[in-house]
């Protein structure tokens, strides 16, 4: 998990001195606050029922055994995803991953300076071997949004992020 290695973390801390940490949902400066108080109500409205699985009757899951989504893709959440994908904001993808670790796995978020760190969830045994982010087209933006979102999830679950085992086919 190189994202959370000492050198990477130090460089991000330095960046946050020059460019303070922002809310991925509304772009407000957060600094050392773990979450944005202005977005809490809007996010509560978009929150899904506390279930790890989306119902197959409502969503096409293909060959997947299950899938999870902490929010409906609308409003604040949609803006945050679009900010991460199209507005040169890789930090927004990481913040979304932190939020997913908190909501889907119950990870406590500890602030390390200005960086939110999801704590590993003790006793979590869901049978995960790794987190496999499905690559988005990162050639234009220079970073992979799903991979950035996966880093906090991997830290919370205690498994590696594997990025080199998928093959594009046409």
Named regions from a protein language model:
Residues 1-170:
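Glycine-rich phosphate/pyrophosphate-handling loop used in enzymes and phosphotransfer proteins
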